[in-house]
Amino acid sequence: MNFSKVKNKLQANNLNIKDYLTYLTRKGVTPLMRGIYISLYRFNKIKIPFFKGKNTRIIHSNHLITGRFCYIGDFSYINCLSKKGVKLGDRVTIREFAWLQITSDTSNLGEGIVIGNETYIGPRCNLGAAALLSIGDKCQIGAGVSFIAENHSFSANSAIFEQGVTRKGITVGNDCWIGNNVIILDGVNIGDGVVIGAGAVVTKDIPANSVAVGNPARILKERH
């Protein structure tokens, strides 16, 4: 380690050595130790280094496949039980309080989740993927975003809980930026390079290189 570079970095960011070491321990060393434990248990599917946050639960980890340098933040719930599992590319970050669930009923397994290389998912995101949820490479997904890859059927002829669900899936292309608290509904396909403004509700497809905002989301302009 080049200590002069570390010192210069600390000074440039107004950090003292105690703050730096605390951050390094809580965000790096301790999650890495937790990750090594699960990586050894699933060595053929979870690649080292893998970082697992405090009080994070990974259920059915035999259905989880990761690339290198994946990070899952504190207090997250990851239920991987599904037909195709949960597949994370290299350097995927899933921040604190994430909720990923694919299957809620073992008699009707969900499809799975695929997240591409170097994609960042912010804190308190919900990824519900009864149908397949696919997110591309190098995406930035803000805090509190919800993906809902399933929809309830309804009519006036019977009770809601008796009417079942439909499943189409959600696809997000590469290099997309999805703002805080966006909701993306089942059946939506989002092209490469799309920007979606905070709080939008996406109910239909968004073509590549578009900027979309609002509820329901509408195309505002092209991304240049």
Task: Tell what function each PLM region has.
Residues 133-224:
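Glycine-rich hexapeptide-repeat left-handed beta-helix
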